[in-house]
Amino acid sequence: MKTIATFEAPGDYQIESEVMNAHQKSSIGNALIRTYMERDYIVPEKFEDFVYVGLVLQGQGMRHGLEAHRRNRPYCMGTLYWQLNDSWPVVSWSSIDYYGNWKALHYQAKRAFAPIHINPIQRNDSLCVYLLSDRLDTLEKMTLEMKVIDFEGKKISKPMLLKSLSVPANTSQCVYRTKLDALLSSTKRPLSEELLHCFMLLTLKDKSGHVVDETVYFFAKTKDLLLPETTISYKMKQTDGECELTLLSPVLAKDVFIEVPLQGARFSDNFFDLLPGERKTILITSPQIKKGEELPLTVKHIRETYN
């Protein structure tokens, strides 16, 4: 929003306003954003929320594509995406805007291109967990832990642990496959209902116990998930040039977006899922951050955009 605010007045905030259309060089661009949003998300009424959900939509869509390409090695051996950045303040496919702000896509591309990446995929009534490697060496004695957790933080199935995994160089391999009803056999709700109340947390560790990759997987489209309402609490610690932000939510907060009114500010992470009871620390850096000066902060998550 801080980039849109550089070329459009708040009184004109509409997706099809004359100014917004002038800054959208695809004749079908804004309509296409809404079409895809209606498919996967609950479309917000507020303009600011529409912009935020549009960013989330772009990031998730591109991430799914990048992961599919990696998963289908050797038929696909690499991906370049359109586009990296912008030459002016505009609505576009870029992952970094004109002022150097990272969009959701840039964070999702960073995750999807991790050298070792966990990629679960549903096929009909089954779940297959892939390990994707772009490394040039084989990793041995890896451990993959998988937990199914509801949105309030309760584990709803026994954790699964795969030990002594080998991850060969430059490979895509399915290391775990199961039927969804077997995965959630201990739950009391019908399977179709339970899948809307939970997520899977997958963590890959090396032989020293260090986390190599972690993925949060949902079993349904975001618009179908029965996400809980929540308020994210946070604490800030500022010094010259940086702000340490610690976030906490009692229940799941999906697609958390942190924004400060500083063009080009860097975030150690953004557009992430904040897990129930998890304390997550984000480092914000900018030469404009000053110790002792209040830093205006916006923290938003998907559930807040529901009308």
Regions found by a protein language model. Give the residues of each.
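C-terminal accessory/binding modules appended to enzymatic or scaffolding proteins
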Residues: L227-L275, I282-T285, I302
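Extracellular ectodomain segments of secreted/surface proteins
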Residues: F113-N124, F219-D240
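Intrinsically disordered, low-complexity Pro/Gly/Ser/Thr-rich segments with frequent PxxP/GP/PP motifs
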Residues: L144-E193, Q263-K290
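Conserved active-site loop/cleft motifs that coordinate metal ions or position small ligands
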Residues: G78-Q83, F257, P296-K300
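Beta-strand-rich binding/interaction modules
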Residues: L127-S166, N170-R177, C198-K205, L245-L248, ...
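Solvent-exposed loop and beta-edge segments used for protein-protein assembly and interaction
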Residues: R123, T138-E140, S192-L196, T239, ...
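Terminal connector regions
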Residues: K179-E229, P287-N307
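Substrate-binding clefts and catalytic carboxylate motifs of secreted carbohydrate-active enzymes
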Residues: M1-E140
